[in-house]
UniProtKB/Swiss-Prot annotation:
Organism: Marinomonas sp. (strain MWYL1)
Summary of the function given for this chain in its UniProt record: Specifically methylates the pseudouridine at position 1915 (m3Psi1915) in 23S rRNA.
Enzyme class: transferase
A GO CC term attached to the entry: cytoplasm
EC number: 2.1.1.177
GO molecular function terms listed in the Swiss-Prot or TrEMBL record: rRNA (pseudouridine-N3-)-methyltransferase activity
Catalytic reaction equation(s): pseudouridine(1915) in 23S rRNA + S-adenosyl-L-methionine = N(3)-methylpseudouridine(1915) in 23S rRNA + S-adenosyl-L-homocysteine + H(+)
Location of the protein in the cell: Cytoplasm
Domain of life (superkingdom): Bacteria
Cross-referenced HAMAP family: 23SrRNA_methyltr_H (MF_00658)
Quaternary data: Homodimer.
Official protein name in the record: Ribosomal RNA large subunit methyltransferase H
Binding-site residues for S-adenosyl-L-methionine, renumbered to this chain: 104, 123-128
Length: 155
């Protein structure tokens, strides 16, 4: 199984890259976590934000492999517990699906990405910085894998 994290932004602070990499490298090759970085459209005081979001959305939609289950990360999505994430992930694995998780930039996801998603998931009702979401998702994917494999990380 492969979980592809498709996220807007490609110039992350060192702590984000290190945090993400720490959890991604812990996963076995048969349960790979792959990061696909979508360049963020330039932002300035005269930026047409909807146009920038559409451009990012175009790139995100192109990055989704056919056949993947698609999960859009949205503040108003469904909140899952870690156990629910592990159960859902195990079901996807048993059904032979790979998964693409979509994380928007500072102005959110293109509505077409949300429409393309099979499910929407929320980490919190709080608005989280999009770089931090990468680290949290990587840790939660790793934690779900440990639950599925009776690993002592999740107690």
């Amino acid at each position: 199984m492969r979980v592809r994290l498709i996220a807007v932004g490609n110039k992350m602070p060192k702590w984000v890259t290190e945090g993400y990499d720490e959890y991604a490298k812990r996963l076995p090759k048969d349960f790979a976590l792959e990061l696909v970085e979508i360049p963020m459209s330039p932002r300035g005081k005269n930026t047409d934000i909807p146009k920038a979001i559409r451009k990012e959305g175009d790139s995100m939609l192109e990055a989704i492999p056919s056949g993947d289950k698609v999960i859009a990360m949205e503040v108003l999505g469904k909140e899952w517990s870690t156990d629910q994430l592990a159960d859902q992930t195990e079901q996807w694995r048993m059904d032979g699906y790979n998964v693409s998780l979509l994380v928007g930039g500072p102005d959110g996801l293109d509505p077409r990405c949300t429409a393309r998603a099979d499910q929407t998931w929320s980490l919190s009702r709080l608005t989280l910085p999009h770089p931090m979401v990468r680290v949290i998702l990587a840790e939660q994917i790793y934690r779900a894998w440990t639950l599925m494999n009776n690993h002592p990380y999740h107690r």
